């Protein structure tokens, strides 16, 4: 998979270069000046401005490999524009709002310093970001229901195999 970047602080249990490359604002600005940023989103969080981005940093070799990227609809559209429609296959994983909130709360409770206000802000922002209108605008039709992890993964693997 492609490892994205973020300027947000690392959470407990995360490792640099695994979930994200964790960088500061200065490094983001340098990469922007070097024209290495493919797409980015900045959020005015309860803890300050956090930026998430994908960079053309040498880890993407489309002629040799296929990749899995986790992102927003906005990032999907930007990547599709950058790399082309023919190489992008959206895998939209849908989670019922109550379950999504419950999972987020469980993850936040596990932190030494839980950021509940930020959890609430992000939950509401995600509801807007992943609205029906935005899904339709991005051309995302196929959805995978994340109720049972194993079933969801099997369906996604079948879809990936069809598109290879």
Residue ranges and their predicted role:
Residues 2-4:
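Conserved catalytic segments around the Walker B and adjacent sensor/switch elements
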Residues 6-67, 71-73:
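ATP-dependent small-molecule kinase phosphotransfer cores
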Residues 12, 77-78, 98-104, 151-155:
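Switch/connector loops and helix/strand junctions flanking conserved nucleotide-binding motifs
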Residues 12-13, 58-63, 81-86, 134-137:
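Conserved catalytic network of the ASCE P-loop NTPase/AAA+ motor domain
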Residues 34-38, 106-111, 159-162:
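Conserved AAA+ ATPase "sensor/coupling" helix adjacent to the nucleotide-binding pocket
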Residues 63, 157-164:
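C-terminal accessory "lid"/substrate-recognition subdomains
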Residues 66-72, 83-107:
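Conserved phosphate-donor/acceptor-positioning beta-strand/loop module used by diverse small-molecule
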Residues 109-160:
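Small-molecule kinase domains that catalyze NTP-dependent phosphoryl transfer to phosphate-bearing small molecules
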């Amino acid at each position: 998979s492609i490892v994205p970047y973020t300027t947000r602080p690392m959470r407990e249990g995360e490792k640099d270069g695994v979930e994200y490359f964790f960088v500061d604002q200065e490094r983001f600005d340098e990469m922007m000046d070097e024209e290495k940023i493919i797409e980015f989103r900045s959020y005015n969080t309860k803890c300050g401005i956090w930026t998430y981005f994908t960079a053309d940093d040498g880890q993407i070799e489309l002629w040799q490999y296929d990749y899995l990227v986790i992102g927003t609809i906005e990032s999907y559209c930007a990547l599709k524009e950058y790399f082309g429609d023919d190489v992008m296959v959206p895998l939209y994983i849908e989670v019922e709002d109550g379950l999504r909130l419950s999972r987020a709360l469980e993850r936040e409770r596990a932190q030494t310093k839980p950021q509940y206000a930020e959890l609430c802000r992000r939950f509401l922002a995600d509801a807007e970001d992943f609205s029906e209108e935005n899904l339709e605008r991005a051309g995302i039709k196929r959805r995978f229901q994340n109720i049972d992890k194993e079933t969801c993964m099997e369906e996604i693997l079948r879809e990936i195999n069809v598109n290879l």
